[in-house]
A protein has these predicted regions:
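Segments forming oxygen-rich coordination pockets for charged ligands
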Residues: 1-199, 206-212, 273-274, 312, ...
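Conserved SAM-binding strand-loop segment of SAM-dependent methyltransferases
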Residues: 212-218
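Adenosine-phosphate binding glycine-rich loop
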Residues: 262-325
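Structural motif
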Residues: 170, 232-233, 258
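Short amphipathic alpha-helix with an adjacent loop that forms part of the alpha/beta core around
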Residues: 219-229
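ADP-ribose/adenylate-binding Rossmann-like module
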Residues: 197, 237-238, 249-274
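A short acidic, amphipathic alpha-helical/loop segment
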Residues: 183-186, 245-250
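Cytosolic regulatory regions of ion transport systems
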Residues: 241-242
């Protein structure tokens, strides 16, 4: 049985440390080159052990071939030379894979032993990049890198530089009701650092999780006013006065990536009028997205509402703040 593990922060070293268990070695597959159309981007990576996987390099025939080659490599060379077991696959997605993408990808396979992973584990809590040799040697930390390339994978002549974790955008979700619970379930494994806020601890689901930070706050607006300027905000509380206070805190400070409020067109008009009377200027009000979510879905079922909010979040991310109003 092939079990897939998901690490919410995309930190492959932490995932490897969890995945290795009692196994002697696992394979780390990295897409180091992409030409033409391909199912995943440069730097996409996955971990492969005998019975488990973490993440994906694109699924389908491509991933099946990578997994077969990786498991074959583990069995073939075992642990003869720790840290130096690696191979580059050159895969044409049309002829070789029978896929319609038609592009070409190169995948680096590196075999990591338990000791290799333990040595790397010290990096798992930091946003750093590692340099992965294409021919021999163990991954090494990139000590000097400019900010622009720090979180971007790139190919060098004899190695590939890969961040140990993705740079996550801060997302503040206000409200742990039906929609809030459904929304977090949908987006907890996306590229967001989730801060989930409510005034009552009982509203949160039971059990602990590493996929979000739970914040119990008597004054959520105070949390909003201290959020970083690159944060995304989704306001879906049970209370209109709470919604109003959070919106006012965010719009008056005017330092955020996106501010989305759940509600009808009537609520939107009412809130804009109230916020205007409270001193929020028209230019600031234009940055409030209400109703939040894509327009094509009109259902009021909590799960469907959560789906259309979740669908808008990556649009916000990828357009970097262009869609407002």
């Amino acid at each position: 049985m092939h079990k897939s593990l998901i690490n919410p922060n995309g930190n492959w070293i932490a995932a490897a440390n969890h995945l290795i268990g009692d196994e002697k070695a696992l394979a780390h597959a990295i897409i180091i080159s992409v030409r033409g159309s391909a199912p995943r981007e440069l730097g996409a990576n996955m971990l492969i052990s005998e019975n488990q996987i973490w993440n994906t390099v694109g699924g389908g025939s491509l991933e099946f071939e990578v997994m077969e080659q990786a498991r074959g490599l583990i069995k073939e060379i075992g642990l003869k030379v720790e840290g130096s077991n690696r191979k580059v696959l050159n895969l044409a997605l049309g002829p070789d894979m029978g896929q319609c993408c038609g592009g070409n990808v190169k995948v680096l396979l590196e075999i990591l032993s338990q000791s290799d992973i333990k040595k790397l584990a010290k990096h798992s809590q930091k946003l750093v990049a590692l340099e992965h040799p294409l021919k021999s040697g163990a991954p090494t930390e990139v000590l000097r890198t400019d900010d622009d390339k720090k979180f971007r994978p790139f190919l060098k002549k004899e190695s590939f530089v890969l961040p140990t974790a993705k740079k996550l955008d801060p997302l503040f979700i206000y409200g742990a009701g039906h929609v809030g619970r459904a929304l977090v379930k949908i987006i907890e494994h996306t590229d967001f650092d989730i801060h989930w806020i409510d005034i009552d601890e009982k509203r949160f689901p039971e059990g602990s999780t590493s996929t979000f930070s739970k914040v119990i706050a008597l004054d959520p607006a105070l949390i909003a006013s201290h959020a970083p300027s690159n944060a995304y905000h989704v306001i879906i509380t049970h209370s209109h006065p709470l919604d109003e206070a959070i919106c006012f805190a965010l719009l008056s400070k005017d330092q955020f990536r996106f501010c989305g409020l759940i509600g009808s067109k009537t609520k939107n008009s009412r809130f804009r009028s109230l916020l205007s009377k409270m001193g929020i200027k028209d230019e600031q009000l234009k940055k409030l997205t209400c109703p939040i979510g894509i327009d094509e879905i009109n259902s009021k079922q909590p799960v469907k509402v959560a789906i259309w909010i979740a669908a808008q979040l990556p649009i916000w991310q990828e357009t970097n703040g262009i869609r407002i109003g």
